[in-house]
């Protein structure tokens, strides 16, 4: 059963898996929760090739921004006022770019198109926070790469709010 955990915090785990497909495209995966179980989960092939894993992660977050905004608008319209929206990612370089925008680009990331910095505007407007999530705890890995054994069952349990 899906339910909110009472903290009024919308949490979204986003991950990009670099060059997963034969055509060298990357994979975006994400899951959103109000505490107990996922309210939105997605896994999509990215529409463009990327040069770095940082760019893959930035595009993954950009791909899921409409889901974040729409869900927050729907929740507010239904009377559920969230205190915070937190986006979790496991790539510190992508987090830096998302928070600071183009000005924190280096020679490895200055080619990234400005359209992928929509998330920076949302961060600066205080519509969401961006936090680091260690790779071993990244629930979105469930949607971007093949998992085996313990991790598969751990993430499935979190996403579906299953009991032991």
Q: Where do the PLM segments sit?
A:
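Generic recognition of flexible, low-complexity loop/linker segments
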Residues: 1, 18-20, 74-75
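RNase H-like nuclease module associated with reverse transcription
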Residues: 8-9, 44-164
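Structured nucleic-acid-interacting core domains from mobile-element enzymes and related host factors
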Residues: 1-14, 80
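RNase H-like nuclease fold core
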Residues: 11-56
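Beta-strand cores of modular interaction/reader domains in eukaryotic scaffold and signaling proteins
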Residues: 1, 13, 33, 88, ...
């Amino acid at each position: 059963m899906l339910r909110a955990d009472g903290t009024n915090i919308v949490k979204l785990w986003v991950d990009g898996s670099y060059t997963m497909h034969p055509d060298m495209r990357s994979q975006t995966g994400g899951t959103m929760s109000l505490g107990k179980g996922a309210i939105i989960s997605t896994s999509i092939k990215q529409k463009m090739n990327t040069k770095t894993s940082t760019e893959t992660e930035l595009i993954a977050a950009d791909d899921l921004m409409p889901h974040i905004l729409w869900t927050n608008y729907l929740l507010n319209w239904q009377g559920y006022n969230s205190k915070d929206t937190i986006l979790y990612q496991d790539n510190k370089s992508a987090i830096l770019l998302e928070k600071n925008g183009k000005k924190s680009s280096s020679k490895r990331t200055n080619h990234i198109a400005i359209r992928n910095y929509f998330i920076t505007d949302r961060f600066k407007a205080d519509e969401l926070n961006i936090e680091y999530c260690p790779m071993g705890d990244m629930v979105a890995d469930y949607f971007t790469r093949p998992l085996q054994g313990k991790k598969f069952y751990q993430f499935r349990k979190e996403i579906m709010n299953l009991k032991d």
